[in-house]
Amino acid sequence: MKKILFFTVVLISGFSNAQDVRLLKGAITENVVVNDSLGETFSVYLPTYFDLSRPWPVLLVFDLEGKGKSALSMLSNAAEKEGFILASSDNTNDSLSISQNVLISNRMFNNMVSLVPIAKNQSYAAGFEGGAKFASILPTFIKEVKGVVSIGAPVGNIEILNPKSPFKFIGIVNRNDFNFREMEALRDVLDRLKFPNQLLVFDGEQLVPDQNTLASALRILTLNGMAKNEIVADPQFIQESFDMFLAKSNSFLSNGTPVLAEYLLSDMKRIFNPLMDLDSIKKTEKSLRRSSSYKQANRSQNNYFLKEDFTKEDYAYYLEEDILTYNYPNLGWWKYQMEELDKLDKSKVLYERQMASRLRGYINALVEDNIDFIAADKTVDVEALNFLYMLKTIIAPKDFDNYLKIISNSSRIEDYGTALFYLEELLKNGYTNKKQLYELPDTALFRITPEFNMVVEKYLKEARYEVIEQ
């Protein structure tokens, strides 16, 4: 049975407007009200062993689609293990300005401070992808936030970082992620700015890290607090943490990934300075770097980095040219490029497979950025948008929204041949939402053509011939 806390804000914060707040321990409490007049809410996770007798570290978790509970659920196991409170707003959104999102976050944070005892200098921010980019700029605006856990994304804006107010930055990234290269380069930038930082790198099919990696990031925040004398040092905790990270490094070696082992050993020197003597780590790292297995693996990875850089330059150049000239014939070249990446996915060479994954992520992000840029223009270039949507069907064939946009845009200019082609491609790829098809904007005339309904009947077994009222 879940344990339940029941207390009033006034008993903790002295607010004049008391409200009863019921927070679950070991589970996510949704729809906690920030401000009745603004209609803002957030979700909270408290560890099962939470009590009001001592202050706790808090991690503000951001998902810019406003899915607070979903964001918390991915970090709740790590928070349970490492003793962190989690809070996530339901109202932050990428459609809002940075200043609006900061104000929403600040109101949530202030509400958290009034509800539960928060440890001094132990308030942090975290996020996944877009949410991570926002989290990385939050310490600039909310001074109580002392660190960031950024999962799969670099710092949102390097220019606003203030060397006089550094915060802890912990990046977590898969080597398959196209952001990996940028996050790796970010370490040097943060070092120059004297921002303490680590980068936890992992491999695997899933771009989202496992729970142990997420828990490691939270543990590093605690160790950093001990190193700065903001948290009372616990020698047993420090030694257990050291042994845990060293065991992880050894597992990388035994699994044939010496580069990952070197990444972690390098970070251990940062994490445990000045908490303990680092001579053993320095010797281990030096020995690893001299080994033939590491030299060969590092050389191979760097060679693929170079090849990747050249390919990215080609992608950027040809995409710009194709957009400017509406170069539809070159869609065949892009299809060939994706087929080549598909072949590399089956390579026996790890670094080649990882390069293919990063390149696919890069071109997808590049196309998305161009779509956003063109769509935001006062005079939207519909033909350029249509080209990009067509390209998206090649690089992300299961993203059905792009097919629907092409069908709608093509029908608007009565290019029914193009609309029909992408209708069939859409259905070939497994799309089944007939209701949405018959309600697509600007397709009223197209939907009543025999050709449209024949294709629908071919793949969905039944067509609707009458005109549907809009």
Regions found by a protein language model. Name each.
Residues 17-55:
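A domain-start/cap signature at the N-terminus of enzymes
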Residues 48-55, 98-129:
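Gly/Ser-rich "nucleophile elbow"/oxyanion-hole loop immediately N-terminal to the catalytic nucleophile
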Residues 53-65:
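Short beta-strand element of the alpha/beta-hydrolase
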Residues 69-89:
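Short amphipathic alpha-helix adjacent to the substrate-entry channel of hydrolases
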Residues 112-115, 120-166:
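Primarily recognizes the serine-hydrolase "nucleophile elbow" in alpha/beta-hydrolase
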Residues 169-174:
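Short beta-strand/loop motif that positions the catalytic acidic residue
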Residues 196-269, 275, 282-289:
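C-terminal catalytic histidine-bearing segment of alpha/beta-hydrolase fold enzymes
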Residues 351-428:
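Alpha-helical adaptor scaffolds
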